[in-house]
Amino acid sequence: MNLKSIFENNDEKPLDNIPADGGYTAIFRTIACVGDSLSSGEFEADNGNGGSSYHDMFEYSWGQFMGRMCGSRVYNMSRGGMTAKEYCEGFADANGYWNPKYAAQCYIIALGVNDLLGQKQELGSPDDITAEDKKTFAHYYAEIIEKYKKIQPRSKFFLMAMPSEGEKDG
């Protein structure tokens, strides 16, 4: 990959040139995706009663596509409807995700839609990160990072921005 073609091109658009081999993502041999339905490859299906059912289809998640492209092992530590609070208060423990066997060189955390837009949880502030009594989104999000940093101190973290409520394409 020629970095000059990226950094010296003011008109460069990252999605116009996606390397078929995953590019520099391949430096990470293990990647963990912590998130909600946007991370779990969730499919919606007709339940036959006029409603919908939802199914996590990890094989179709963007994390697994990325893993196949770059040859990395990707752990899906996600579920449709997931919140940072639920992840910390039971989901991670129940699924063994704090277990060092899932230690990764890279963690991609994509939470917030269900927390802030769905459950209208208080966002919080940096002061909440270490406050035990202030259970805000910021507190739980930081707790996830802190626990994985203890499991794998040299890991890198990529925090995904979430879509805005009512955001339009274009």
What does each model-identified segment do?
Residues 1-58, 67-68, 102, 150:
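N-terminal secretory targeting modules
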Residues 2-8, 77-80, 158, 164-167:
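Short, charged N-terminal helix-start/capping segments
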Residues 17-20, 91-96, 143-145:
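A generic local structural motif
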Residues 30-35, 39, 73-78, 105-110, ...:
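Structural recognition of the beta-strand scaffold that forms the well-ordered cores
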Residues 44-135, 139:
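Conserved SGNH/GDSL esterase-like catalytic core that processes O-acyl groups on lipids
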Residues 114, 145-170:
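Active-site segments of SGNH/GDSL-like serine hydrolases
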